[in-house]
Amino acid sequence: HRLKVGYSAWTNPFNGVKSYVSYQNTRFIVFWSKNPAPLISHLDYLKERNIDCYIQFSLNDYEKEHLERGVPPLHFRIDTFKRLVDKLGKGRVIWRFDPLLLTTDISPDKLLQKIENIGDQLQGYTEKLVFSFADILTYRKVKSNLEKNNIPYIDWTEEMMCDFARRLVQLNKKWNYQLATCGEKMSFDGVAHNHCIDDNLIIRLAYNDKTLMDFLKVKTYPMPTADIFGEIAELPNDAIILPNSQYATHGNNQDKGQRL
């Protein structure tokens, strides 16, 4: 696997330029996958290398509609999710239902039922649900693939998205997950905008890694205690609560990587 080799190479299909990524100084990896089961056997190696991680697990349910070919059955993927959490911890595996796709066979009601089924089974195993609405008309390749496979899609309207988000927030009252959208311009009450690479989460998970924290420009402070009048100072708006009776703040970490 590429970590043992020490680097990865990628050739840009448009201009033929080859780029290299070195893993010599890697401290943290964020994984995205619809089927991260093969990763489980490599997690101990990451630990040996002192490389921390979290996983964005796209756990959808389009099984009956055969829209995601090549992924294992839903029950297997839910079991994989739980095995990953047992290995890594609840905060390190994020549930994504992405994208939310409407067809003549999949109504908003049916989508909510699919989400509820998975959400009920993941209670106690995740803290967060990230979702996005399939923007089919914007992505010609997606539109072409759906039409090629005779899948009669329905594009989301703003009114439909707002209503769906409202109903999902209501549904979430029994789970209390953090709800967040991915790549959506619209805002919805009770739903945050997700970060693809969430530096706040990385800090919360890897606050003991001084090298990484220095790179992320993190400063830590003791949690405020009551003064002689019993008053407790308010935390800053950007405070990240750590598990060691401290909180952290950080600088602007946007796009620290170099693109060749």
Language-model features: locations:
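Conserved C-terminal portion of the radical SAM core fold
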Residues: 76-143, 167-183
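Surface-exposed cleft-lining segments at the edges of enzyme active sites
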Residues: 63-71, 99-109, 147-156
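Catalytic beta/alpha-barrel core
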Residues: 32, 132, 155
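C-terminal accessory extensions appended to soluble enzyme cores
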Residues: 158-260
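Conserved Radical SAM active-site core
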Residues: 1-67, 74, 79-90, 257-260
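Active-site glycine-rich loop that binds ribose-phosphate moieties when present
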Residues: 113-117, 156-162
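Short, solvent-exposed loop/turn segments at secondary-structure junctions
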Residues: 36-37, 60-62, 100-102, 136, ...
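Short, surface-exposed amphipathic charged segments that create phosphate/polyanion-binding patches used
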Residues: 70-71, 143-147, 193-201
